[in-house]
């Protein structure tokens, strides 16, 4: 039994430590020495170790990192995290202003520094941080809560018991980025190209204690549904975030004219190098929320905001060679190889030249001196050829007569398309690129199969098409250098797991030209199976919203190919799902809301969601008092304790399946009922 005195001491220590965290990491105004701070933390850790029942998720001790993470759950955003339109010049920012003025008058702007980091969404319930989600594709992101808890400028508990979602940027300060890269080089590892890449990589580490060592920082700038907190402007929102103890960039400014915005941009174009973090521009937002709503959004970005980016830096280098890469469809892309040069914080050695017409139009030759820049601050490209420095030894580049990968014949597409392609249907480079697409997250999401391993598997003759992946075994992969038993086991497990993916993911992986995630979902919704889709004609397909005649033609040609029929048959025999998710088959779970924590034996998170919905139930990622059931697998998270606190009924997987059987649901024979000993209660 813990005495009341100990409980009070623990609570007092937590409040003191969080107060000093706020003074140091947010305000940069410490009032105690590091030694005094360390004593407070040490005492709290001692008490929590002695009385583990006093440890809570919002304790400052949880920032140092705890148990290893098994992986990252994909979570839907409460509202999309849209990107911003951007511009690089004053005329376009004035045009932006004129578009605004056509809709609203008396406009004010808030100008904020555009931090070069990773966008994050933070969800708080009753003042406690419950979830941190990366931007991902804007609709869904990765749950990186355990890692974000190590960022000391992000409060684990708000000073008010609010339920709120805020968004901002997590970044790696320049000082720590440079130290981190030096350390990587000393260890023989490749340095990160920029702080943004380093931050993204850090947030996806499986060990939170390693994340804590990398000293990430944050700035928050956005509140979801701000009117719920009686906020009328973006400037009000920034002040409210400060009140909630979030770190807000001190250089944000309220401006009354577009000329003031331009002056602000010019000021920071010069001053940005003096900052302790990287910025790549200025974000300009209409201040008034009512005006924002009146202006509205496009599908991709708000009309009331724009990123006013800094002009790209340019450096001079020499073209040492022009090499060729072969893509998934056989397209041959020329690539310029440079003398290594530093550009905006990274070493640039190469840049795509897109196609051979581009080389001809810009007269780019081996031996030329060129200026290069980063398009959008990211992608290296040649901006100017210094033809006046030529000495006559420069070499013009002509399209290859044979494929650089397989030696097969090369041809140019008819019509306006300017690419040269390898015509060998068995070119290994095509297969390698296709498999890279097939295993990608947007497609079959087979983790562990990176480009290097794929290349080795293809070169060893173990796979001749994407379907052959499902016939690999432990003896096949044991032939591949660099693959140990654990990695082989993980790869085979990932391949097996992917068999149950919905067919929209398989459709993306098949690589049909024009069929991405959005169209794949439309097709999976309309057609019950891959077989039914394969029988559709061009007229029928082209009448589907979002699918024009060109894509319809691509789909029909793909499914009419004998090779496609062979691949689909091999996939079917391997047990890969070729049928669409069932629509609601009954209403036995009608009105019931389910949430899941931990790893289930028979279902992935997406599969259990679809299964529950097919029975009329509702699936949610967020456990609340209104949730009816929490379904618990192995290694459950904090939702289990929350369910007990809220009085939500908890089921293990066996109990869930038995409940369905009693309600008359016919279970698949392949589903194993987990043994009672595997449950935690």
UniProtKB/Swiss-Prot annotation:
> What's its catalytic activity?
NAD(+) + (deoxyribonucleotide)n-3'-hydroxyl + 5'-phospho-(deoxyribonucleotide)m = (deoxyribonucleotide)n+m + AMP + beta-nicotinamide D-nucleotide
Q: Which UniProt keywords apply?
A: DNA damage, DNA repair, DNA replication, Ligase, Magnesium, Manganese, Metal-binding, NAD, Zinc
Q: What does the entry list as the binding residues for Zn(2+)?
A: 403, 406, 422, 427
Record keywords: DNA-binding included?
no
Q: Which PROSITE patterns match?
A: BRCT, DNA_LIGASE_N1, DNA_LIGASE_N2
Listed GO biological process terms: DNA repair; DNA replication
Broad class of enzyme this protein falls into: ligase
Q: Which cofactor does it need?
A: Mg(2+); Mn(2+)
Please list the residues that make up the active site: 114 (n6-amp-lysine intermediate)
Q: Which SMART domains has this protein been placed in?
A: BRCT, HhH1, LIGANc
InterPro entries named among the record's database cross-references: BRCT_dom, BRCT_dom_sf, DisA/LigA_HHH, DNA_ligase, DNA_ligase_AS, DNA_ligase_CS, DNAligase_adenylation, DNAligase_N
Q: Which GO terms describe its cellular component?
A: cytosol
Q: What are the EC numbers?
A: 6.5.1.2
| Coiled-coil boundaries | none
| Residue ranges crossing the lipid bilayer per the database entry | none
Q: What Pfam families does this protein map onto?
A: BRCT, DNA_ligase_aden, DNA_ligase_OB, DNA_ligase_ZBD, HHH_2, HHH_5, Nlig-Ia
Report the CDD domains cross-referenced here. Answer: BRCT_DNA_ligase_like (cd17748), LIGANc (cd00114)
List the molecular function annotations (GO) for this entry.
DNA binding; DNA ligase (NAD+) activity; metal ion binding
Q: Please report which protein family the annotation says this sequence is part of.
A: Belongs to the NAD-dependent DNA ligase family. LigA subfamily.
Q: What does this protein do?
A: DNA ligase that catalyzes the formation of phosphodiester linkages between 5'-phosphoryl and 3'-hydroxyl groups in double-stranded DNA using NAD as a coenzyme and as the energy source for the reaction. It is essential for DNA replication and repair of damaged DNA.
Which PANTHER family does UniProt cross-reference here? CHROMOSOME TRANSMISSION FIDELITY FACTOR 18, DNA LIGASE
Q: What is this protein called?
A: DNA ligase
Q: Which gene encodes it?
A: ligA
